[in-house]
């Protein structure tokens, strides 16, 4: 049986930008079953975000094809900061911050990759043991300053200044690849396009110290842009996190289900494990019946399940269906808070109040006349029930958990009213 061609699959999915030695990597994959590959992430925060999924999806595909992925947490480099993609110096973190972030990221990665045929390493293990004299003698002599200055990541910072600390980051990352290659048999490094210079520096160091025939390869990923030309990865509310405490499964699901028709097929290829045939079928449905949003629903389903599991997906779908249909009575307070986090909000007292006054006082309606008209026309729902009597009294004692009264105006215009 022929081997699965992982590189061709990645190309079809639009996941490869540059390769250092495609022919050499293909030859290695054809002759060996033991490829190990890695990508690094510095513990600059306590949660991964969807931008991290871009390289991680490639590692996951290699893992599913039987290869050995390694994620390198930059406990050493994270204390310094990668200048790639930045115009200003990073604020250095305390040792306590770095340690806390490392633990949080490790737990998230284990959820994505499991524990079989997967490894998490920390470069503090070896970088922390190198003193300045050893650094200069054993590694520094292999790096030419003129070459380092010409790397894009450094050249773009020279005008405004770059510290020696960040200038040496590429040497530290090169040491990482050298260490993992020599001691752990890692042959391939994955990174974003802005990591090309750091990756090639690592390969050069390996070849200088271990010989030019030592297998060492690099692969970078294209910059993910949306159809409107903006960078992928942000929602209207900012970063989309993998931590459910920062971005709830419902918000996460909504991010994917609201993707543009022009982007959705690209994201299906990149962020799901659906087959070529399944994706092509969804592409056809998007073209013929875009209003059904079949591709967006499948995208949201697959990525939410991958990150938050079956339970997180079911909850996200339950909240979505309830808010869409208006049948919200079976939602828990936590689910209501998830679903209406970004909805307009208001406050009201704990006393009963006529519905017309309630709507005006909470600024849901601009005037009593408009409030009466909307109530009579059946456009107002209180906690899921349509109220058409202008004499109806809103009773806070019937609020969800004694805390929230939910007003819906029209089909899906919700306001979350907190009872004080």
Curated annotation (Swiss-Prot):
Residues spanned by motif 'HIGH' region: 43-52
EC number from the UniProt entry: 6.1.1.1
Subcellular location: Cytoplasm
GO MF term set: ATP binding; RNA binding; tyrosine-tRNA ligase activity
Residues engaged in binding L-tyrosine: 38, 169, 173
Protein's name according to its UniProt entry: Tyrosine--tRNA ligase
Binding-site list for ATP: 234
Quaternary assembly: Homodimer.
Stated family: Belongs to the class-I aminoacyl-tRNA synthetase family. TyrS type 1 subfamily.
Start and end residues of each S4 RNA-binding domain: 353-419
Keywords: Aminoacyl-tRNA synthetase, ATP-binding, Cytoplasm, Ligase, Nucleotide-binding, Protein biosynthesis, RNA-binding
Catalyzed chemical reaction(s): tRNA(Tyr) + L-tyrosine + ATP = L-tyrosyl-tRNA(Tyr) + AMP + diphosphate + H(+)
Organism lineage string: Bacteria, Bacillati, Bacillota, Bacilli, Lactobacillales
General function of this protein: Catalyzes the attachment of tyrosine to tRNA(Tyr) in a two-step reaction: tyrosine is first activated by ATP to form Tyr-AMP and then transferred to the acceptor end of tRNA(Tyr).
GO cellular component, one term: cytosol
Locus of motif 'KMSKS' region: 231-235
GO terms for biological process, alphabetical: tyrosyl-tRNA aminoacylation
SUPFAM superfamilies documented for this protein: Alpha-L RNA-binding motif, Nucleotidylyl transferase
EC class: ligase
């Amino acid at each position: 049986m022929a081997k699965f061609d992982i590189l061709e699959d990645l190309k079809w999915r639009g996941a490869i930008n540059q390769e250092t030695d495609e022919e050499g990597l293909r030859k290695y994959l054809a002759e060996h079953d033991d490829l190990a590959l890695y990508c690094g992430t510095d513990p600059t925060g306590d949660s991964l975000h969807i931008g991290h999924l871009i390289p991680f999806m490639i590692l996951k595909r290699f893992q599913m094809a039987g290869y050995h992925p390694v994620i390198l947490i930059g406990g050493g480099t994270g204390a310094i900061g990668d200048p790639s993609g930045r115009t200003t110096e990073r604020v250095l973190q305390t040792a306590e911050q770095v340690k806390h972030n490392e633990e949080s990221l490790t737990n998230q990665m284990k959820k994505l990759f499991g524990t079989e045929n997967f490894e998490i390493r920390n470069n503090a293990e070896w970088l922390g043991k190198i003193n300045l004299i050893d650094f200069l003698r054993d590694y520094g002599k292999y790096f030419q300053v003129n070459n380092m200055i010409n790397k894009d990541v450094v050249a773009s910072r020279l005008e405004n200044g770059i510290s020696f600390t960040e200038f040496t980051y590429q040497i530290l990352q090169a040491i990482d690849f050298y260490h993992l290659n020599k001691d752990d048999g890692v042959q391939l490094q994955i990174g974003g396009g802005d990591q090309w210079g750091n990756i090639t520096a690592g390969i050069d160091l390996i070849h200088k110290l271990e010989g030019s025939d030592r297998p060492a390869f690099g692969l970078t990923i294209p910059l993910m842009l949306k159809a409107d030309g903006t960078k992928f990865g942000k929602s209207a509310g900012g970063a989309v996190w993998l931590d459910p405490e920062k971005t709830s499964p419902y918000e996460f699901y909504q991010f994917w289900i609201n993707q543009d028709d022009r982007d959705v097929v690209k994201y299906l290829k990149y962020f799901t494990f659906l087959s070529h045939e399944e994706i092509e079928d969804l592409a056809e449905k998007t073209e013929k019946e875009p209003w059904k949003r079949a591709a967006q629903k499948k995208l949201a389903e697959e990525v939410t399940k991958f990150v938050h599991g079956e339970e997180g997906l079911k909850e996200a779908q339950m909240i979505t269906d309830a808010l869409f249909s208006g049948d919200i009575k079976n939602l828990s307070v936590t689910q209501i808070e998830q679903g209406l986090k970004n909805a307009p909000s208001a406050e009201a007292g704990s006393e009963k109040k006529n519905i017309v006054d309630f709507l005006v006082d909470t600024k849901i309606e601009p005037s009593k006349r408009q409030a009466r008209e909307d109530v009579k026309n059946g456009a107002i729902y209180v906690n899921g029930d349509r109220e058409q009597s202008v004499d109806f009294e809103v009773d806070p004692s019937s609020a969800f958990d004694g805390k929230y009264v939910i007003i819906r105006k029209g089909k899906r215009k919700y306001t979350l009213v907190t009872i004080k």
